[in-house]
């Protein structure tokens, strides 16, 4: 894709900045006693609960209790929380180094569907690697705090209003096709990222090749 002028970068978090493996988390739920029959009957429910947990738009305790109801007797909320920690994924330090450099040339924002628990754990991951969110991003916009989620048009409108960014000069990276499409429809130069493979995209390669 041929990029127009770029002044602002907006990144999703899971699958773009941090490498994630949702499938491994679902499999880990099976280890808590979700039987084969329940897997078949409740797979949509489990996926809904995972989505609900990640986005943080429903009370976390309520979501965890629904998950607990699907598990074997004797399973605790703590057992489920331990499994869900895997959603924090693996954070490549090279991407964080690149973000710091990109901020010298662009405004850099994070726009993520994520809950408070996962975000706090993600901040700890950044800190362990020697970075703070303020070093990496000019602003952070999270679904649980905004009380809205991608791909709703309202979340793109709000980040635009709060930052003053120009959608036409904004490059937006997201690994969910529906989010990337919504961003494109809003006016962003949108990149549908292959999950966990940001570096493979020409748009990423172009913006980092000239930074020092």
Regions found by a protein language model. Give the residues of each.
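Asp-based, Mg2+/Mn2+-dependent phosphohydrolase catalytic module
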Residues: 2-6, 115-116, 122-212
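Active-site neighborhood of HAD-like aspartate-dependent phosphohydrolases
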Residues: 2-45, 69-70, 185-186, 199
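Generic structural signal for small/hydrophobic residues in well-ordered secondary structure
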Residues: 12-15, 56, 110, 140, ...
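Alpha-helical elements of Rossmann-like donor-binding domains used by nucleotide-donor carbohydrate transfer enzymes
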Residues: 24-27, 48, 62, 66, ...
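Helical cap/lid subdomains and adjacent loops of hydrolase enzymes that gate the active-site channel
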Residues: 37-43, 49-52, 80-88
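A metal-dependent, Asp-based hydrolase signature
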Residues: 50-81
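Soluble or luminal CAZymes and related metallo-dependent hydrolases
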Residues: 59, 87-94, 151, 155
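Substrate-recognition element of Asp-dependent hydrolases with the DxDx(T/V) motif
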Residues: 77-127
């Amino acid at each position: 894709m041929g990029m127009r002028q770029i002044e602002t970068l907006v990144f999703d978090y899971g699958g773009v900045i941090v490498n994630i493996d949702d499938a491994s988390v679902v499999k880990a739920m099976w280890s808590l006693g979700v039987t084969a029959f329940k897997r078949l009957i409740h797979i949509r429910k489990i996926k809904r609960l995972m989505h609900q947990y990640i986005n943080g738009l429903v009370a976390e305790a309520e979501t965890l209790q629904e998950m607990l109801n699907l598990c074997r007797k004797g399973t605790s909320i703590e057992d489920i929380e331990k499994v869900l920690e895997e959603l924090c994924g693996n954070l490549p330090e090279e991407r964080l180094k690149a973000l710091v450099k990109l901020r010298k040339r662009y405004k850099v924002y994070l726009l993520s569907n994520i809950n408070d628990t996962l975000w706090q754990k993600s901040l700890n991951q950044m800190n362990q690697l020697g970075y703070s969110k303020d070093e990496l991003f000019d602003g952070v916009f999270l679904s649980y705090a905004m009380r809205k989620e991608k791909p709703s048009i309202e979340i793109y409108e709000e980040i635009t209003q709060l930052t003053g960014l120009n959608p036409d000069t904004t490059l937006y990276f997201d690994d969910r096709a529906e989010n990337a499409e919504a961003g494109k429809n809003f006016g962003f130069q949108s990149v549908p990222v292959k999950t966990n493979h940001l570096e493979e995209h020409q748009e990423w390669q172009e913006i980092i090749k000239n930074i020092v």
